[in-house]
Amino acid sequence: MNKDWTSIKKVGLPKLKLIMEHEIMSIYRTKEVLIQTEHEKMFVAFCQKVYKYKEYKEETYWYVNDGTTKVEDEVVAWMELPDRYEGE
């Protein structure tokens, strides 16, 4: 694996930030990163982790297109996005 890629299996997810807390659940989200799936597809996406207290359940999802589309394949690696182009 390229040195810039981070294996989810070996290292884990990007840093999660709490975005919503409620008495029945908490939702955490990462910033957008470049991901690669088990089928070698690549997307710019963010990860969202939901903790459901009543069910003692933890769910992790990846989303693309500003959160409108869920990534169905298993995400195996991620890398930081480069800085935005500022122009000349």
Give residue spans per PLM region:
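Secondary-structure transition motif
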Residues: M1-E88
